[in-house]
Amino acid sequence: MYLYVSFLINSLLLSYQSCSSFQINRFESYRNHLEFVLITWPPTMHLYISYFFPLCAISLGKICNQGKHPLVPFQFLCYFKNHPFIIYLYFFRPGLYQFIFRTFHISSNSAAHIFFHHDTGNRMGPWILAKQSLYSPVQNPQDICFPQQLQLQLINPMRKCRVYVIQDAF
């Protein structure tokens, strides 16, 4: 009981200190792709928000943005094969995300495929899959910049969303 209370207090403190620092919960690198789980709160609070407060993340987003605008994005800076890219995550309403890709650099004559797997909340049910492909016709990979966006209509908006980035050579 003491450990649980201590964990909860530490989680709340971490959440307060990291209000504007939205983190990546899990980052795993494989041979040809990487996986990370987008979250809307520090990892210690992810479980509570995802499974007990399905609408809480939107309210917390407004608070963390100091009420300036509810659609101010949450920014994630990631690296794939030493190439940086930024993901902006917007909340429009429960169940609708918009992922904005900026400065997505990939090698020339290759393609980067973005796969979104969204947990429907049904343990026996399938994950929702959406695919966004980015192609590189430019010879100089330093000049490649993809301002892409993808909207997903999700069943349970605040559950885990896995993002796969796979780069394939033609």
UniProtKB/Swiss-Prot annotation:
Residues 1-21 form the signal peptide. Keywords: Membrane, Signal, Transmembrane, Transmembrane helix. The chain crosses the membrane at residues 36-56. It is a single-pass membrane protein. It is found in: Membrane. One of its GO terms (cellular component) is membrane. Partially overlaps YER085C. This is Putative uncharacterized membrane protein YER084W-A. It comes from Saccharomyces cerevisiae (strain ATCC 204508 / S288c).
